[in-house]
Amino acid sequence: MAKRNRSQFRIQERTAKKRKHEDSLLEGNVFQNAPEDMDENTIYSAKGSSWDEEEQDYEMVPRKNRSDTSNLVEGLPIKVNGKVERKLHKAQEKPKDDDEEDEDSNDSSEDDEGPNEEQEAEAKEDEPDTEEKILQLKEDIADLVTKVMEEPEENTAALGRLCKMVESKNPNTCKFSMLALVPVFKSIIPGYRIRPLTETEKKEKVSKEVSKLRNFEQALVYNYKNYVGRLQSLSKTPSNAAPIQVSLGILATQAAKELISTASHFNFRTDIFTLLLRRICKPRISTDPTSIQIIQTFETLLNEDEEGSISFEILRIFNKILKTRNFNIEESVLNMLLSLDVLHDYDPNTKLKGNVSAPKLKKKDRVHLSKKQRKARKEMQQIEEEMRNAEQAVSAEERERNQSEILKIVFTIYLNILKNNAKTLIGSVLEGLTKFGNMANFDLLGDFLEVMKELISDTEFDNLSSAEVRKALLCIVSAFSLISNTQYMKVNVDLSKFVDGLYALLPYICLDADIELSYRSLRLADPLNNEIIKPSVNVSTKAELLLKALDHVFFRSKSGTKERATAFTKRLYMCISHTPEKTSIAILKFIDKLMNRYPEISGLYSSEDRIGNGHFIMEADNPSRSNPEAATLWDNALLEKHYCPVVTKGLRSLSSRSKECSK
């Protein structure tokens, strides 16, 4: 009983001391200054409790479990003294991901949220792409392309996202999306130009389908414009830039080439034409792998254009670029003009005949229409005009206008090249003048003839190469082709310079080994030749050009005389001894035709009953100075033993005809 009372007394005493101590702490604000993380042991130590009642530090430390294998990884077991022992080693801790650290930093700083997101996007673009990322990128692009191809009007957002990906700084994203958009645009581009809506059309009420179609057309034009602009910026990459940028520029050029082959009628075709023409209008295009394909694309467009609008647009841009580049381009680029097919049925003389306007009807002969009827007729005419514009139906007058403008630009380009004396392009210019010369305008005739006379005068007839012989022949044929268009006008032009040049060329033509060969001839290409060879559209051989020039001199112009016919016959007989079989036969047929027009040349076959002063000067390059009346065709006796029986037969026929003419 006494023990129980003592224990109760002690408990009460201890409780009283505890309360007193807590009251003193409250009065001294000790709890307010105490740290928040103060545990219960610290509080009891502050009370002054006895050491026996407090828990010691080592009692609070958890016991070590030696068998804890949470951080251990079991390796391969080993066998020691016949016993198998387990081998454990510590597992390597994985470092924290950068993404988690970025998320923590983003959560801590909400104010810098916008700039951090942009930096993260740029950092992601700068990161090298792994195979997994590239595969995922291809799958995403394929999904977007599938959506647009299946329902283009419903998925304009997917089209916009693809166009946005082209502007990415990541080269893989830019490349894959740019190439993927080519078949997309080729399939969804309509067969007509899309014009902007007028203010009246925007305000008027339309059906759901029309509104849906208009929204799709406007979205298509907007995205297509951005895409073409991106192609333009990429294609301007210089060749000394980074290899990745150069490859992107080549891919952009190829994409533009593919687009324009099917979308030449659509909006922004001028931008694509400019992009491609700037790419090939260079002094050396052999370094550009896309140049040959671009030239072939333009040739196809010029050859298939029947209306003339595409050809006119291409030539207008081409002329402008040529002036800025000072005509410093390759010949294969200029040869594109020879593919123009829209001029094949153009006759500039019909314009003069068709300009006669129909006589106006007198007032008494007109059909009387009321004011209401006139208004209705005017509205109907406007509707018909809008329908024609929508259908892009080109009338005969518009086509003829396009042909006239195209021909004007072509001759302007050729004349400027001749005036600037661009030697590498003269051959192509003469090819073009030979093809289009008969359509030349009378105003340009004098300029062309003056330039061509200078070319013939500057030609040194001492030692000419095969290419120089062809250029001189083309110059002569072109000059006569230009004059042939003026037959309906009374124009007298002195062409003696070209006749003398043709006479001087004959010895070099007959000694040319390739006189009957063109680029179509069956010959193996030189494997060591790396140049881009664009054969001319005018595939005439030198023999054909020679016969064409002779025909112009004696049968299509007033340049032929008895004296010139005699001199040319003598020199042509000298050429037959060296020319191949087919050329020799063709020359004999020409002489037979010439004898019908100028029977005086029959005197060359015999020296009987003929009075001649002096002797024939064989070395003279001017027919009037060679004294042709004193010439004799002693070559006939030599050529009678020619290896070709057809040539021998032709010579005998001419000899017998000469005897009939001299009687």
Swiss-Prot record:
Pfam families: CBF, NOC3p. The modification Phosphoserine is found at S395. One of its GO terms (cellular component) is nucleoplasm. It is found in: Nucleus, Nucleolus. SUPFAM superfamilies: ARM repeat (SSF48371). GO terms for biological process: cell division; DNA replication initiation; pre-replicative complex assembly involved in nuclear cell cycle DNA replication; ribosomal large subunit biogenesis; rRNA processing. Residues 98-130 have a biased composition (Acidic residues). Residues 82-97 have a biased composition (Basic and acidic residues). Keywords: Cell cycle, Cell division, Coiled coil, DNA replication, Nucleus, Phosphoprotein, Ribosome biogenesis. Residues 363-408 form a coiled coil. The keyword Cell division applies. Present with 11700 molecules/cell in log phase SD medium. Forms a heterodimer with NOC2. This complex may be associated with pre-ribosomal particles. Also interacts with MCM2, MCM5 and ORC1. Belongs to the CBF/MAK21 family. Required for synthesis of 60S ribosomal subunits and the transport of pre-ribosomes from the nucleoplasm to the cytoplasm. Also required for initiation of DNA replication. May function downstream of the origin recognition complex (ORC complex) in the loading of CDC6 and the minichromosome maintenance complex (MCM complex) onto chromatin during the G1 phase of the cell cycle. Essential for growth. This is Nucleolar complex-associated protein 3.
